[in-house]
Amino acid sequence: MSKILIIDDDEELCELVSEYLSVEGFTTEAVHDGETGLQKALSDDYELAILDVMLPRKNGFDVLRELRKSSKLPVLMLTAKGDDMERIVGLEIGADDYLPKPFNPRELVARLRAVLRRVNDVDEKKPAAEAFTVDDIEVSLTGRTAKLDGTELNLTAVEFDLLVALLEQAGRIVKKEDLSQRVLDRRLSPFDRSLDMHVSNLRKKLGLREDESERIKTIRSVGYIYTVV
């Protein structure tokens, strides 16, 4: 049974979400300010955190920034409906997914389960090998870690799965539709930029090659390719 941390100052919403998630087989704990939420999130007692942006004492973005310095705990951010900037910033600083308020509880559950499936590596398409290497990147599938020139990369669950998906097809184009289905566990929609933001974050963490070329190239209107040397 997965334990979910809810960080939101709307106590009524927390109660409703907790009741719904309980029926769906989750256990929950709710806190109502950013400082307490960060302390709880760093305790390693939870499988996932639901994090609101607008919080007293420490806002959701600051909580996520601090959390990502030392934790890979999956985070689903609650953003204001129609506020693209909140969504983009959240994804840029390490959120695994987002959901605008107000939301359908069924969609919340679907997104939680999708994130947890990715984290637990329940993916029929993963290769049989437990580890593999492409150029200067070493990947451990069992440990869910990736090293660049021997130094471990600080990747979120989504970024790790995205890197694996691209490296498995290194030198070949991977369609955005296929990446979205595999990495985000949902069909690609016309206005959803989540995948693009995760690719952008991954690019920043990988950096350029020694010849200043990009490791991940965008094939306009098609997808992405991890280049090989």
Regions found by a protein language model. Name each.
Residues D45-E47, S70-V75, S189:
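His-Asp phosphorelay/catalytic-motif detector in bacterial-type signaling
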Residues G25-D33, K40:
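Short hydrophobic/Thr-rich beta-strand motif most characteristic of the beta2 strand and flanking loop
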Residues K3, A114-I173, E177:
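Short, Lys/Arg-enriched segments at the junction into DNA-binding effector domains
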Residues E124, A129-A131, N154, M197-V199, ...:
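DNA-binding patch around the recognition helix
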Residues D45-I50, L55:
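Active-site beta3 strand of CheY-like receiver
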Residues E12-V23:
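Charged docking surfaces used in two-component/phosphorelay signaling
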Residues I7-D8, V31, A49, L99:
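Conserved sequence signature across two-component system core domains
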Residues N59, R65, K69-S70, P74-F132:
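Basic, amphipathic DNA-recognition helix from helix-turn-helix-like DNA-binding domains
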